[in-house]
Amino acid sequence: MACHAEIYDSYMQTGMGKSFHFATKQHSALTDTDLPLIHDSIKNLFYQPFWKNDSLYLLEFRLKGKDTTHQLIKKIDYKIGSGQHTNSHLFEINGYVHQMPYTYYTQDKIADLPPGFEKGNNTRFSREIGIECMSCHNAYPWHESGSTNKYNAIPQGIDCERCHGPGETHVKRKLAGNIIDTSKYIDYSIVNPKKLPLDLQFDVCQRCHLQGTAVLAEGKSFTDFKPGQHLSEVMDVYLPKYENEESFIMAS
């Protein structure tokens, strides 16, 4: 990051830069004094996060009268979500990543079950975090081929390449002294989204912010899209269409 240190440092304070990280006090929206208890009334399970030094844990328990009839503690390894709206929580066992049944809504300072866990659908600690989810909420990870939710390495936060494309060629050319006056010319060793045609600019954002059902093209994966491509080269995104409804959903 030596070439663009100020830009990088500024970017890391944005929602995308804070999108995914270890669940430590530095990166979590949960504080020592703000750890809301939640209750799944259908399955009669309570969830209470707590800190132990700089590690975050989630306690699941069930009560019958004054007796505790069930108790399970799991360490939270990652927080997902910048904290602008939410922090959700993940744990990892031997590279396999699952979501935990606890989401903190930062603006209202309340906690609840994550979306999809409500109304009796609380899968507790078994929801797998697949590559479609991980590849939008984080930089592209090293995903184990053939696995749903096993990762050989997991980055921390959406990186520069998500909007600017692979940077290896760009770095090599700059280190070799090939400097372009970008006030006059386009530097084709890296993608500047501002210089893309409008439809390709939208495709960079719509890769993750268009809320629909993504269907991959044959032979493609969720990590194949690169800025400057047409999104349709990698996937088609289908949106629900309602009668007399002209709007579509974009994720914030």
Residue ranges of each PLM-predicted region?
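Residue-level signal for beta-strand positions within conserved beta-sheet cores that form or flank
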Residues: 98
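Domain-scale recognition of modular recruitment/scaffold domains used in eukaryotic signaling
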Residues: 95, 106-110
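Well-ordered mid-protein domain cores that form the structural environment of catalytic cofactors
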Residues: 109-140
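Primarily the internal scaffold of c-type cytochrome electron-transfer domains
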Residues: 5-82, 88-93, 101, 112-118, ...
